[in-house]
Amino acid sequence: MMAKKVYNHDDGVRLARYRDDFEHASVYGKWRLCWKSKDLENHAHKVYAIYSYGSHFPMYVWDELSGQWLGNSDKYSRTTSTHQSKYRPSEVAKWFGTAELCSIIDCGLVGYITNRMEQGLPVS
């Protein structure tokens, strides 16, 4: 599916609420296929991520399997903080740092938790 070009944040926020792919000059949202899910090898698992100024800073992630919004607790810039406020979903189940949220995009929430447990790391 091709991302819808939007020219104002209000349209972007509306599309993000419906988890539609969109592109704005500084914010975009798109579905991603989780590719590192060992525990879900035979199942298609997707997440919807909303980014500010590139894929290095995901603001929010919808995990399709758990049916939850996950948020980025880190701050990046004043403009990105404005984006985080504007695009914030009505309910965020859990907050993660940028690196953790990027890992969740790669393998989904279940894959992320499984990987942490296998490495003997705490799951908070």
Model-derived segments and spans:
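Terminal leader/tail segments of proteins
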Residues: 1-124
